């Protein structure tokens, strides 16, 4: 589903890679496959229980839409729990309640500040993508 790359840094995954919760387990215990991404140890450890930057959320949301078939096949082959609607709702709710300027994890040793304008733009872009996909 992620082309054998770390979701966060796009480097090839090592033989021993980790699974990260996009929305950290400490914020919302959600093990649905849609909340999980492959990560190398360095990125996963650095992100820890931080919320990811809006750019990561945008890429995650796009992959849920464009790789729907890959995700369904993975769920079927592994029997993993899938709940895309709930996971998307958790993401929307989590970011909707953030204070302007909240630090978001962008990369190892780099945070970005939450900007409501960027979040609103992402939500509108996603709504447009969903309308186009439904046509």
Which ranges hold each PLM region?
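Extended charged
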Residues: 51-135
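Short leucine-rich amphipathic alpha-helical surface patches
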Residues: 44-47, 75
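Gly/Ser/Thr-rich active-site loops/lids in small-molecule metabolic enzymes
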Residues: 41
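Short amphipathic alpha-helical surface micro-motifs
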Residues: 2, 19-20, 87
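Long C-terminal interaction/binding lobes of large macromolecular proteins
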Residues: 3-5, 44, 132-135
